[in-house]
Amino acid sequence: MYKKLNAKGAIVAEFVMYTTESKDLNSNVEFYKLPGTINSNYLKKFPIYDYKERRISISEKNKNWILLIPYKFKNKEKEIEQYYQSWKDKDTDKNNKVGELEIIWIKSNQEYFSYNVNVNPKERNYVKDSIVLVGTEDGLYPYWNRFIKS
């Protein structure tokens, strides 16, 4: 289903961890454990730039777990990488040929439009400086297809 919708330009923007309720429930959770999820079509409509100011473009054939991380969190690189690597290892079926963890350091202070009226309503439904997973037709976690159907 994702491939059909994706071919028509469908955008995935999942920032449920940034609703008021989720932020209250997760107030003691490290920021890097609360990612958003987007697809590569999102990046076509809402450009995000790496820390060298180059526009990010992700191929649908990329099999990696792609993380976009604001450069201001570079000092937490080890913790962030360990957390997502353990998540990837836990969620990856041994027979599933999932790629590597791929970290792309992005320019700090960028915003993501959430398409969700319950996400940061005072900030016009934008999320600033979130760590974001980028799902592709061939990549991200094994349940990506199920995730986007819900």
Name the predicted role of every residue range.
Residues 1-150:
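Nucleotide-cofactor and metal-assisted catalytic machinery
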